[in-house]
Amino acid sequence: MKRMIALDGAQGEGGGQILRSALSLPMITGQPFTITGIRAGRAKPGLLRQHLTAVKAAAEICRATVEGAELGSQRLVFRPGTVRGGDYRFAIGSAGSCTLVLQTVLPALWFADGPSRVEVSGGTDNPSAPPADFIRRVLEPLLARIGVHQQTTLLRHGFYPAGGGVVATEVSPVASFNSLQLGERGNIVQMRGEVLLAGVPRHVAEREIATLAGSFSLHEQNIHNLPRDQGPGNTVSLEVESENITERFFVVGEKRVSAEVVAAQLVKEVKRYLASPAAVGEYLADQLVLPMALAGAGEFTVAHPSCHLQTNIAVVERFLPVRFSLIETDGVTRVSIE
């Protein structure tokens, strides 16, 4: 019988990242775990609908036995079984992030007995989680280099707080993992600005695009009007395609916040990324830790190692026989497998 791993949910930033990482890993390794103090660092601690959906999805996919899977629970015991490929559907029941649920369970399906499809309904454009286009256009091309073949499709948008969106991913078992090397970003090839609108006047998007164009030379400027029943909502994105990597940044519009202020927040974030020669942005760095650990080799550079990144590394090192090295030189941190 494998040893139970005990985790402290207050570790790092005390949010949901440690729980998501902890759920992904035992599905792969077969090691049970217990976690206490779930989301202890948040104003409303314990499991929210999004986290509970991730727990139930993980349990269904690997036939786990679970204790503490209920709203508000701050303690969870998870004993995994065998991962099974198949066609899965999960509903969050709120505007909680579809992509965060997908990112919890998809790594386990890289080791399944056959191809799978996972569909999640909930929020797709959430200020605290990556939109599906980030997964599709940024993360999945990098996963393909590592040897992971999955394809995410956005079936319907669902903005916060209403939700109602649907995202699906098709994934195949991995034959072998490759080392990812992302030491340098390379020269910029092009930049693309994009605005999504649902039940919001078009002039909002035009002002947002104008703000982006005032700071960057945009090769593309796209405005997409979605059906009103998918809103109200507004997301502004800017994609930076470089020689070695494509990064994508976004800001979700808010009520009583002007179009110019929303777009200016995005401009600030992109300028911060471009000010450093690091290849990887802060959020993408979090997502590369687990696949790189499974490959057993690789490296990337990031300007600022976030608390999320360091929490993710700490959890991965509890479950897998790997050690990460973080070396800072001239304002850039090189993250690699020792």
From Swiss-Prot:
Signal peptide: none annotated. ATP binds at Q103, Y283, L284, A285, D286, Q287. The active site is at H308. GO terms for biological process: RNA processing. PROSITE patterns: RTC (PS01287). Keywords: ATP-binding, Cytoplasm, Ligase, Nucleotide-binding. GO terms for molecular function: ATP binding; RNA-3'-phosphate cyclase activity. One of its GO terms (cellular component) is cytoplasm. Its main location: cytoplasm. Its EC number is 6.5.1.4. It comes from the Bacteria. Pfam families: RTC, RTC_insert. It is found in: Cytoplasm. It is an enzyme of class 6 (ligase). It catalyses: a 3'-end 3'-phospho-ribonucleotide-RNA + ATP = a 3'-end 2',3'-cyclophospho-ribonucleotide-RNA + AMP + diphosphate. Belongs to the RNA 3'-terminal cyclase family. Type 1 subfamily. Catalyzes the conversion of 3'-phosphate to a 2',3'-cyclic phosphodiester at the end of RNA. The mechanism of action of the enzyme occurs in 3 steps: (A) adenylation of the enzyme by ATP; (B) transfer of adenylate to an RNA-N3'P to produce RNA-N3'PP5'A; (C) and attack of the adjacent 2'-hydroxyl on the 3'-phosphorus in the diester linkage to produce the cyclic end product. The biological role of this enzyme is unknown but it is likely to function in some aspects of cellular RNA processing. HAMAP family: RTC (MF_00200). PANTHER family: RNA 3' TERMINAL PHOSPHATE CYCLASE (PTHR11096), RNA 3'-TERMINAL PHOSPHATE CYCLASE (PTHR11096:SF0). This is RNA 3'-terminal phosphate cyclase. It comes from Escherichia coli O6:H1 (strain CFT073 / ATCC 700928 / UPEC). The gene is rtcA.
